[in-house]
Amino acid sequence: MGIKQDNGKSITVTISEGVTGTLEGTILTFKGPKGETSRDFLSPLVKTELKNNEVTVSIPVSKRKYTRMFFTTIAHIKNMIEGAKEGFTYELKICSGHFPMTVKKEGNEVVITNFLGEKIPRRSKIVEGVKLDIKGDIIIVNSPNIEDAGQTAAN
């Protein structure tokens, strides 16, 4: 993934090998070996174009409001390309002191029983499209979408 800045108002991001991109209206989608990510870039401030395996993001003027959306859009695009190519992984360690707790996956939820001695089990949602594995005292969260993987880890 390479980045090329034409001037202060336009940046071109080159799509990595093994990743394909499509732009339908305002929805940008990347497909790669680790999965597919898509996002709606509906912003009147930023213009997004996809040509020749490159995504060009541009703004009409260099004002603070425009540049904030400009660089945020570029960061989202870079994360989407990286997620489609390599994916994002979070590893969480289950630590229990005095009270032995158990963690198991049930459907689209993680159930934590006996957390700090509580009688009622805690349930945390697994965001759709996220793969979660529990191996001993390690929880592994995988997803091509960084936001979904991070939200599942936070839950």
Named regions from a protein language model:
Residues 1-155:
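Ribosome-associated RNA-binding proteins
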